[in-house]
């Protein structure tokens, strides 16, 4: 049986590969073990053969080195594969992000183009209207006396607004303008001609700036739209080594948006000034006794607009108050739930601590830091952390409830102030202004 096994095994190599032997230091260690030589000449020194323990140690060293090399190689292959996947995903993600950013940029440019186009139309239309008013102003009649009492009474009534509602809004500005017209109608008529001419020039300058900005954005839109269509299969893409460098004259997204915003703001400011000037011209083009009809109409519009703003703000405040009250109720329930949760954590903590306490009386070597002991300590820590988290959240919720109560009182105060302002503007001022005189003299064509 043993001979068959030996025959079936592969033959041992018949020769030893020729390799250079490592140079060993000429150190001879004493061999006092049972395998020492029996010759007298070598007594006290080991033979040239290795011990069996040394042979085993050498094999173990070789095995460990082979395992270490394989493990290091496998780790390197895994890291290489992971790096390839990460770089590919990063490249795709970066390109997708850039394409998305280009799309968002196109939306931004389109938005500002639309705003510029709208403002260009509005400024152009307003300029034409102002030119017509200037022609009427050149042949206007002297103004007449205006109902001074109504204007001053409106101002006095609106001074009784409370809190933050005591604001100098468009209505108040128009009323002050009306009073000033009564006192300075003759002088105002002479100054308005020059003012109208100046406003027309400013409107045209603002419109020119808007048109230049619109032209630049239209060109930029074409470039970004072209860039957004590029992909890895595009045939007209190539390397541009210096393309990633920033130009010295580039703008930031903030300054880019701010530039257009300022242009639109300036145009709107000039347009609003032009609207106000036309309203003023309408007033001074009237007969002296009835000159304020146009101003009356403008004030009526502003009053109505202001009342709508107040009512809209009041409705929104009432909506926020309703939601705040609902949130107060929800927060109160949340606080109750947190308190209950804190109370519910007491029994588990008592159980865990009691278990630890009882197990501390185990005798002698039985007082072992076993898995149960470690898990009980961990459980106490977890429950303590839960206690702390719940208490912290309870404090935050109680502070939130106090903040909600403060907000509720502030909302109720604002609602009352706005209701008072609506009463003053609609019931007091607008009702009083229904007594304003009307007639053909107010048309300003005589």
Curated annotation (Swiss-Prot):
Keywords: Cell projection, Cilium, Cilium biogenesis/degradation, Coiled coil, Cytoplasm, Cytoskeleton, Flagellum. It is found in: Cytoplasm, Cytoskeleton, Cilium axoneme; Cell projection, Cilium, Flagellum. GO terms for cellular component: axonemal microtubule; microtubule cytoskeleton; nucleus; sperm flagellum. The gene is tekt4. This is Tektin-4. Belongs to the tektin family. Residues 182-215, 297-346, 378-422 form a coiled coil. Microtubule inner protein (MIP) part of the dynein-decorated doublet microtubules (DMTs) in cilia and flagellar axoneme. Forms filamentous polymers in the walls of ciliary and flagellar microtubules. Contributes to normal sperm motility. One of its GO terms (biological process) is cilium assembly.
């Amino acid at each position: 049986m043993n001979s068959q096994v030996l025959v079936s095994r592969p033959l041992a190599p018949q020769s030893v590969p020729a390799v250079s032997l490592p140079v060993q230091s000429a150190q001879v260690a004493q061999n006092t073990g049972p395998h020492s030589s029996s010759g007298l000449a070598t007594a006290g020194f080991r033979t040239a053969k290795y011990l069996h323990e040394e042979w085993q140690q050498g094999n173990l060293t070789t095995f460990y080195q082979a395992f270490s090399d394989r493990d290091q190689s496998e780790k390197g292959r895994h890291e290489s594969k992971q790096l390839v996947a990460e770089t590919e995903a990063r490249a795709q993600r970066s390109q997708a992000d850039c394409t998305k950013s280009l799309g968002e940029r196109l939306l931004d440019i389109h938005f500002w183009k639309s705003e510029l186009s709208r403002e260009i139309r509005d400024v152009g239309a307003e300029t034409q209207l102002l030119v017509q008013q200037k022609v009427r102003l050149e042949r206007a009649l002297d103004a007449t006396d205006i109902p001074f009492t109504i204007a001053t009474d409106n101002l006095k009534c609106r001074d009784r607004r409370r809190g933050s509602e005591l604001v100098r809004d468009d209505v108040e500005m128009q009323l002050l303008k009306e009073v000033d017209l009564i006192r300075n109608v003759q002088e105002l008529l002479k100054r308005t001609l020059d003012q109208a001419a100046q406003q027309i020039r400013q409107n045209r300058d603002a419109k020119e700036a808007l048109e230049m900005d619109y032209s630049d954005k239209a060109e930029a839109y074409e470039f970004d739209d072209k860039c957004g269509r590029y992909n890895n299969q595009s045939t007209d893409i190539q390397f541009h080594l210096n393309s990633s460098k920033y130009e010295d004259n580039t703008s930031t997204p903030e300054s880019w948006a701010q530039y257009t915003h300022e242009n639109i703001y300036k145009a709107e400011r000039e347009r609003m000034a032009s609207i106000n000037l036309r309203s003023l011209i309408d007033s001074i083009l009237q007969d002296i006794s009835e000159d304020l009809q146009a101003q009356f109409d403008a004030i009526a519009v502003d009053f109505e607009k202001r009342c709508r703003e107040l009512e809209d703000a009041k409705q929104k405040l009432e909506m926020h108050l309703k939601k705040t009250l609902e949130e107060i109720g929800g927060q109160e329930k949340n606080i109750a739930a947190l308190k209950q949760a804190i109370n519910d954590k007491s029994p588990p903590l008592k159980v865990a601590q009691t278990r630890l306490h009882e197990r501390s009386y185990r005798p002698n070597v039985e007082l072992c830091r076993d898995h149960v002991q470690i898990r009980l300590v961990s459980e106490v820590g977890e429950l303590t952390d839960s206690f702390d988290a719940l208490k912290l959240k309870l404090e935050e919720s109680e502070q939130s409830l106090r903040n909600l109560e403060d907000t509720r009182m502030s909302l109720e105060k604002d609602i009352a102030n706005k209701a008072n302002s609506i009463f003053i503007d609609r019931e007091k001022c607008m009702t009083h202004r229904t007594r304003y005189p009307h007639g053909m003299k107010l048309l300003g064509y005589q």
